[in-house]
Swiss-Prot record:
It comes from Pectobacterium atrosepticum (strain SCRI 1043 / ATCC BAA-672) (Erwinia carotovora subsp. atroseptica). It catalyses: Hydrolysis of terminal non-reducing N-acetyl-D-hexosamine residues in N-acetyl-beta-D-hexosaminides. This is Beta-hexosaminidase. PROSITE patterns: GLYCOSYL_HYDROL_F3. Gene3D superfamilies: Glycoside hydrolase, family 3, N-terminal domain.
């Protein structure tokens, strides 16, 4: 299995998709809204992806809830992370977050999807890229809710990816469109943004981490996703993280400062990433596959889902019915809350 995760064009695989997925450097596929028409089509697409490679690829999606939910029709409308604590008592926020993590993961596993890149562990709501995707503006409260969400994901059989290390919440710029710079002192980043990552690593609750395409100017001239300081010195050595490190999508503008697509890929791997995402730019992905040195990434097999239930079994279960009702209600309350603020 190789270290490259990429995307496919549409609702079903075309000839180029199949050829790309057979490449020995490919280890995973990430799905987007453009890959989803309905539940039956999605199930068939995942089957095609499984059949296209000699390896069992890691199939992934961003199904966080709120504004980042790639699959909607036929799936529970999940509330934004901010909604849990914003509209409920602490104990109720934790209860609903655990059900949210479980239900999100279970609905994906029932489609034979291994991971949803969640949860977002960034602190605060001021960043354009993060906003309602963050659990809370206070690190301690964000941690309390995140722990419950993670417990739910794990109970369904899905591995957890915390993002975006060491914290994207304090920069207003959107790394999808530019390379944000965070000028704060390192001591502040460590005491505020990194607190949640440190706590979850110490309690061994994170299976994977995705770093930010943000330059922390007091630490390093490179974005964290291409920084050996952040990934090796801090994450591996100082915090003792031994899970999988993903790059965020190397086609985002935040990664452009790292050079051409092959240069970005090489920089991310050399900095300490185990798997690199190259999405929404097929030409860039192919140039990475053509130019990257052979790399084996067998540790990525740890990311496979552990569920063995069917979608019908899930939808018939009392837990799903109760969770679906509670989370749909919270999602509607959150939408009404936001509309009332405008």
């Amino acid at each position: 299995m190789g270290p490259v995760m990429l995307d496919v064009a549409s609702y079903e695989l075309d000839a180029e998709d199949r050829e790309v997925l057979e490449h020995p450097l490919v280890g995973g596929v990430i799905l987007f809204t453009r890959n989803f028409h309905d539940v039956a089509q999605l199930r068939e697409l995942v089957r095609q992806i499984r059949a296209a490679s000699h390896e069992r690829l890691v199939v992934s999606v961003d199904q966080e809830g709120g504004r980042v939910q790639r699959f909607r029709d036929g799936f529970t409308r999940l509330p934004a992370a901010q909604a849990f604590a914003a509209l409920n008592s602490v104990s109720e926020a934790q209860r609903l977050a655990e059900e949210g993590g479980w239900l999100m993961a279970a609905e994906m596993i029932a489609m034979d999807i291994d991971i949803s890149f969640a949860p977002v562990l960034d602190i605060g709501h001021q960043s354009a890229a993060i906003g309602e995707r963050s659990f809370h503006e206070q690190p301690e409260m964000a941690l309390a809710v995140a722990q419950s969400f993670i417990r739910g994901m794990h109970s369904a059989g899905m591995k957890v990816t915390g993002k975006h290390f060491p914290g994207h919440g304090a920069v207003s710029a959107d790394s999808h469109k530019e390379t944000p710079r965070d000028p704060r002192p390192l001591a502040e980043i460590r005491a505020h943004d990194m607190l949640i990552f440190k706590a979850l690593i110490q309690s061994q609750q994170l299976d994977a981490i995705m770093p930010a395409h943000v330059i922390y100017t007091e630490a390093d001239p490179h974005p964290a996703s291409g920084s050996s300081y952040w990934l090796k010195t801090v994450l591996r050595e100082e915090l003792g993280f031994d899970g999988i490190i993903f790059s965020d999508d190397l086609s985002m503008e935040g990664a452009a400062v790292m050079g051409s697509y092959p240069e970005r890929a090489q920089a991310a791997l050399q900095a300490g990433c185990d798997m690199i995402l190259v999405c929404n730019h097929r030409e860039g992905a192919i140039s990475v596959l053509d130019n990257l040195s052979p790399v084996k990434a067998e540790q990525l097999t740890r990311l496979y889902h552990q569920g063995s239930f069917s979608r019908r079994e899930l939808l018939d279960s009392p837990r799903w019915k109760l969770a679906n009702q509670a989370l749909t209600s919270l999602s509607e309350r959150w939408q009404a809350h936001k509309n009332g603020e405008k």
